[in-house]
Regions:
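Mid-to-C-terminal "cap/lid" subdomains and adjacent gly/pro-rich loops that border
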Residues: 1-89, 144-149, 169, 173-177, ...
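Short, glycine/acidic-rich hinge or "gate" loops at secondary-structure transitions
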Residues: 152-163
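C-terminal structured subdomain/cap of oxidoreductase catalytic cores
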Residues: 1-20, 63, 93-151, 172-246
C-alpha cells in the first residue's frame, strides 16, 4: 500500500499577449471586465465567468511512430503560473503539455503513528529517462503549435522562464524545474491478485474483512486522459457491489 504512485506530469508555457484584453488578466481593464462578468453571470448565468478556463485541448503523439497519443494538451485563457499561486499581471494565455503514460513511480508513506500527521508524498516525477524524453518532445511540439499563424498573429511572447529554453538540454532543465502535478494521482492501492496489490476485483482490501477502497488509487495504471470520469465509474461500480453484497 502506498507504492506505485503515478500521475500525469505537466509543464506549461505561459505567453504574454497584452492586446488580448478579452482574456482573463490582472489589469485595470481586466478587473472591470471581471466585475461586469460577475454581474452578467448573476443575472443571466452567461458571459465570461461560465468558462472552464481550459477551453481547448487535444491528444497528440510525441513522435509519429507512436501507436497512440502519449501527450495531452490544455490551452488556458490566462497566464497561469504555479497553479495560479503566483501573481502575474497583464493578459495572455498558457499551454500545458502532460505525459499520459509515465513509467516513473513514486510512493506515499507514513511519517508517524499519528493518524492526523501528514504523509510523505514522493511523486518521483521524470525518474525514468523515457518520461523526460517524451516531455521534451512534447514541449517542442507545443511551441510549434503556439507559433502557427492562427496564434502568431496576436504577437504573444513566451515568459522568460521558458523562452530561454531552446536546446534539448535547456528544455530538460526547464521541465525539471517547473514540471508539476495536474492532479491525477493513481495507483497507491492498485487492483490485482499479486503480493504487492491492495484490492481485489470487488475493491476489497486483501487480508482485511469489511474494507474496500473506492477511489482513483485502485487503478493499476493511469488512464490516458483525465481521471475524473473513470473515478466516477469506479464509485458507481462500488455502489452496485455493495448493494449486491450479502
Amino acid at each position: 500500500m502506498g507504492k506505485h504512485l503515478h500521475d500525469h506530469p505537466d509543464v506549461v508555457q505561459v505567453l504574454d499577449a497584452p492586446e488580448l484584453k478579452d482574456l482573463f488578466g490582472l489589469s485595470l481593464s481586466g478587473m472591470a471586465q471581471t466585475l461586469r462578468g460577475i454581474v452578467e453571470w448573476r443575472k443571466h448565468r452567461t458571459g465570461m465567468l461560465t468558462t472552464n478556463f481550459a477551453e481547448a485541448g487535444g491528444f497528440i503523439k510525441s513522435d509519429p511512430s507512436e501507436p497512440a497519443p502519449d501527450l495531452q494538451l490544455h490551452f488556458v485563457i490566462g497566464k497561469l503560473v504555479d497553479h495560479g499561486r503566483k501573481t502575474v499581471f497583464g493578459h495572455g494565455y498558457s499551454a500545458h503539455v502532460c505525459l499520459l503514460q509515465p513509467k516513473s513511480r513514486g510512493a506515499v508513506t507514513l511519517t508517524s503513528r499519528d493518524p492526523m500527521a501528514l504523509p510523505l508524498v514522493d511523486p518521483n516525477f521524470l525518474a525514468d529517462p523515457d518520461d523526460m524524453a517524451r516531455m521534451v518532445r512534447g514541449f517542442k511540439r507545443t511551441r510549434e503549435i503556439l507559433m502557427q499563424p492562427a496564434l502568431a498573429k496576436f504577437g504573444a511572447k513566451e515568459l522568460a522562464a521558458s523562452a530561454s529554453a531552446r536546446t534539448d538540454a535547456e528544455i530538460e532543465q526547464f521541465i525539471r524545474q517547473y514540471a508539476d502535478t495536474i492532479y491525477h494521482p493513481v495507483g497507491t492501492c492498485r487492483m490485482g491478485p499479486g503480493p504487492l496489490d491492495v484490492v481485489d476485483a470487488e475493491l476489497r482490501v486483501h487480508g482485511l474483512a469489511g474494507l474496500r477502497v473506492v477511489d482513483a488509487s485502485i487503478m493499476p495504471r493511469i488512464v490516458s486522459g483525465n481521471t475524473n470520469a473513470p473515478t466516477v465509474m469506479i464509485a458507481e461500480k462500488a455502489v452496485d457491489l455493495l448493494r449486491a453484497a450479502p
